[in-house]
Curated annotation (Swiss-Prot):
Disulphides: none
PROSITE patterns linked: RIBOSOMAL_L3
Name under which the protein is recorded: Large ribosomal subunit protein uL3
InterPro entries in UniProt: Ribosomal_uL3, Ribosomal_uL3_bac/org-type, Ribosomal_uL3_CS, Transl_B-barrel_sf
Length: 212
């Protein structure tokens, strides 16, 4: 449980270390996260900080959301996220305040959560890394077919969870243990080592690593 940031994936590039080693990195743009609500044990049964970021057209904001943002004294954002926190982490936080990239430091290990790219309906080879069947030796139309999916009369059915063709991607994915390479407070940008989930422009959540 820790406060994190909601940002937007800008894409990947690379940087060079002093030794000349190329390091692949992902750039995350983090607009100021505006605090819309602070939840406490007394009022909500748990402790959390609720934030919003970005902008949304007024015509796209419901009346309930307008009231919620107005009560907090912040502009309507494109999404609302919550971070479970401890009592100590609530200190100094107040509704209407902001959280920026200075929350993190260079060298800190973080977990990044995003929505993976949707691949549509895919077969077993692409979806589950199944091996293909023989290219020749009498095989004509079954090169990428799954093969047997069950047993015989007993149990006479395909077990739940069997790896088969189906929808791939477009799901919530968390990549753990990424190192922060750079924190640019002037541009509100985080640079993390390695790849993160989702397409360019997608929303991501950056949290202190749970296994660090």
């Amino acid at each position: 449980m820790a406060i994190g940031l909601v940002g937007r994936k800008c894409g990947m590039t690379r940087i060079f270390t002093d030794a000349g080693v190329s390091v692949p990195v992902t750039v995350i743009e983090v607009d100021p996260n505006r605090i819309t609500q602070i939840k406490t044990l007394e009022t909500d049964g748990y402790q959390a900080v609720q934030v919003t970021t970005g902008e949304r057209r007024e015509s796209r904001v419901t009346n309930a959301q307008k009231g919620h943002f107005a009560k907090a004294g912040v502009a309507a954002g494109r999404l609302v996220k919550e971070f479970r926190v401890t009592e100590a982490e609530l200190e100094g936080r107040e509704v209407g305040g902001t959280i920026g990239v200075d929350l993190f430091t260079v060298g800190q290990i973080v977990d990044v959560t995003g929505q993976s790219k949707g691949k549509g309906f895919q077969g077993g080879v692409k979806r589950w890394n199944f091996r293909t069947q023989d290219a020749t030796h009498g095989n004509s139309v079954s090169h990428r077919v799954l093969g047997s999916t069950g047993q015989n009369q007993t149990p006479g059915r395909v077990f739940k969870g069997k790896k088969m063709a189906g929808h791939l991607g477009d799901e919530r994915v968390t990549v753990q243990g990424l190192e922060i390479v750079s924190v640019d407070t002037e541009r509100s940008v985080l640079v993390v080592k390695g790849a993160i989930p989702g397409a360019t422009g997608g929303d991501v959540i950056v949290r202190p690593a749970i296994k660090a």
